[in-house]
Amino acid sequence: MAIMDTNTEVHTLFTQEVAATQQYFDDPRFAGIIRLYTARQVVEQRGTIPTDYTVARDAATAFYARLRELFAAGKSVTTFGPYSPGQAVSLKRMGIEAIYLGGWATSAKGSITEDPGPDLASYPLSQVPDDAAVLVRALLAADRNQQYLRLHMTEQQRAATPAYDYRPFIIADADTGHGGDSHVRNLIRRFVEIGVPGYHIEDQRPGTKKCGHQGGKVLVPSDEQIKRLNAARFQLDIMRVPGIIVARTDAEAANLIDSRADERDQPFLLGATNLKIPSYKACFLALVRCFYELGVKELHGHLLYALGDGEYAAASAWLDRQGILAQVSGTVNAWQENGKQSIDDLFEQVEYRLLAAWEKDAGLMTYGEAVEEMLQFGESEGELIGMSPEEWRRFVGRASLYAAREKAKELGVDPGWDCELAKTPEGYYQIRGGIQYAIAKSLAAAPFADILWMETKTADLADARQFAEAIHAEFPEQMLAYNLSPSFNWDTTGMSDEEMKRFPEELGKMGFVFNFITYGGHQIDGVAAEEFATALRQDGMLALARLQRKMRLVESPYRTPQTLVGGPVAMQRWLRPPDVRRQPRPWAKVRPSTSILCRPRCRRSC
């Protein structure tokens, strides 16, 4: 049967929904948020059949409000990433208000279709949402079980029994978005459908994504990160969910970027000031070819490229002048004679020498540093150039390459500088990573995100304060997040036990409202399993008895596992009529032989 409508009716309903959506955009919840689309574009993609996402919407609304309260009070949530649904429920029951779900644990865990592996986001787009769905389902079940048990308590029992908040306040790992706008939208849609209210998106390049504390990270330009954040917000608006978007940057420890197109990234591009040096790409490929020609056939990356003989000759001559070819020959001879060390390790040693030698001979630096060096020389010679090195440094910190070059021309300064010479064989540009770059990346993302996160190489309050102060100088109400990573060796951070204890509290004072141990649950799971397995081998069933004693001592709900997982709720439908106020029928008083609940004299802990 066809649905009949009139053009007037359709237009009226559409116009009303556009107006309502614009009103939603203008809500104080989104103060300072920029959307690169209109309310009309959102409504055009909603269709006519209403679809509601109650769990995600309500959780997002309440979670955001709570984070705002914490920000205003200079406090924070300190949490970790659970490795199982039981851990997620335990987190909430122990008073930790929010949960982190990271791709690290998802990678390490594997699935029915994916092998366990490192944190490279090499799993399907659906895998983290699938992991999140299990956590959300566990939290909702815990809430139902709690409600059922409390309804069957006396008033005195309810007063003596705390009620826990099992709302799924979760921020989940959206990695790089797994591709373009459509991939980001698909990923956010999956998170919303299963009830997740928060998502973090990072500025690494898909396909080369690394764990935040691994080397070799390749960034995308600032405009690409903004596109991801904007696509996420667009999908949330279509679904009418005020989700919490976290913009993560890896710029503090990254050294590569896949494009120089965005002006905000250009102050951090590295280039050669010795324009006669062979390109880094040519030197690297010549090094690989040298190993290959000496019989190390495992190294053959140069065969991917079509570098000309002239470039190879120039690069090989440079390697020879640096003494690197002689080192290659000695390394290969030693490897062929004993083979005790892997060829990858040996190549890495030579590669490090190549990198250090090339950077030194190339005079690798940013364009701003190249001009500043000339200004300092002129100043030392008593020349009046028109701008001091300090003034230039302040100007060039956020200037595009075009603007910087134009200003240098005005000053009569023209350093030889070429960032193309420093490109890697893959075509990536080298950059000057660090806190200043992370600040620049985050300032660009701030109008499109609810929370900013700078991934760091170690735990350092001074670095955190520098970042927070720079962000809040321009965005005073911007909430921040901090990774309390297990990848750090916290005993080598230089902090005392008391300083480590107060670390999350101090972060809260700076505006870091969501602070998390990414894969803490993975380590808890492993250590607990190792300890119990060891005890079981040594002490037999005494190991279990000791565990049960501990559960009874701390009144853990794990001492009654059937009740914990909802046994009473599961049996309700069979043992009494639907209306709990109605007088039970005689048969309802008889416990069936198939009941999952224990008999009165059973000594089990159910």
UniProtKB/Swiss-Prot annotation:
PROSITE patterns: ISOCITRATE_LYASE. InterPro entries: ICL/PEPM, Isocitrate_lyase, Isocitrate_lyase_ph_CS, Pyrv/PenolPyrv_kinase-like_dom, Pyrv_kinase-like_dom_sf. It catalyses: D-threo-isocitrate = glyoxylate + succinate. Belongs to the isocitrate lyase/PEP mutase superfamily. Isocitrate lyase family. The lineage of its organism: Bacteria, Bacillati, Actinomycetota, Actinomycetes, Mycobacteriales. Keywords: Glyoxylate bypass, Lyase, Magnesium, Metal-binding, Tricarboxylic acid cycle. Mg(2+) binds at residue 173. Involved in the persistence and virulence of Mycobacterium. Catalyzes the reversible formation of succinate and glyoxylate from isocitrate, a key step of the glyoxylate cycle, which operates as an anaplerotic route for replenishing the tricarboxylic acid cycle during growth on fatty acid substrates. Its cofactor is Mg(2+). It comes from Mycobacterium leprae (strain TN). Its EC number is 4.1.3.1. Substrate binds at residues 102-104, 212-213, 248, 483-487, 518. GO terms for biological process: glyoxylate cycle; tricarboxylic acid cycle. The gene is aceA. Homotetramer. Transmembrane segments: none annotated. One of its GO terms (molecular function) is metal ion binding. Pathway: Carbohydrate metabolism; glyoxylate cycle; (S)-malate from isocitrate: step 1/2. The active site is at 211 (proton acceptor). This is Isocitrate lyase.
